[in-house]
A protein has these predicted regions:
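PLP-dependent enzyme catalytic core of the Aspartate aminotransferase-like
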Residues: 81-87, 94-139
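A short glycine-threonine-serine/GTX helix/turn-capping micro-motif
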Residues: 1-8
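Conserved PLP-dependent catalytic core of the aminotransferase class-I/II
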Residues: 9-56
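Short, contiguous acidic/charged loop-to-helix segments that flank catalytic cores in large enzymes
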Residues: 1, 27, 68-69, 117-121
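Conserved PLP-binding catalytic core of the aspartate aminotransferase-like
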Residues: 34-38, 45-86, 95
Length: 139
């Protein structure tokens, strides 16, 4: 069955979340989002570009949303790594090394989209994400 309107009990929990958005203000949320994605791109340039990470997201604030899309030959392993809470296993590290050593360039399917919710992520979380990716992709 399809409904034209959601059930009220299904949307009731949204009230608390929307209160947080109203309290923070959408302009402040957008400003922090841009600052976080800008900072993450700086960290990629500093720590991850030398490991084959390429930024696909536009760098201009007015052309960028709240995420950074990267291109890397080991994109599927990066996704698994981030989904696992940044746990590095021998198997994962081996798969990353194998793909990086293959010499195969990253293709259009080798993209990872990374976002940080400005309502509850901190700049330390952004830094730790870059550091964890550096540990995964580095020697």
């Amino acid at each position: 069955w399809q409904h034209g309107s959601p059930l009220i009990l299904n949307i009731a929990p949204l009230e608390g979340a929307l209160d947080m958005v109203r309290e923070a203000g959408i302009d402040a949320i957008r400003k922090k989002s841009l600052a976080m994605t800008g900072y993450f791109m700086e960290l990629i340039d500093e720590k991850l570009a030398k490991l084959g990470v390429e930024i696909l997201t536009p760098r201009e604030d007015d052309r960028r949303g709240g995420h950074v899309t990267i291109l890397h030959v080991a994109a599927s392993e990066i996704t698994d790594f981030l989904d696992s809470g940044s746990r590095i296993t021998d198997e994962l590290k081996s798969a990353v090394r194998e793909k990086m050593a293959s010499g195969k360039p990253a293709g259009k399917d080798d993209q990872v989209r990374i976002s940080f919710s400005p309502l509850y992520f901190s700049f330390e979380d952004v830094y730790m994400t870059a550091q964890n990716l550096e540990q995964l992709l580095g020697d």
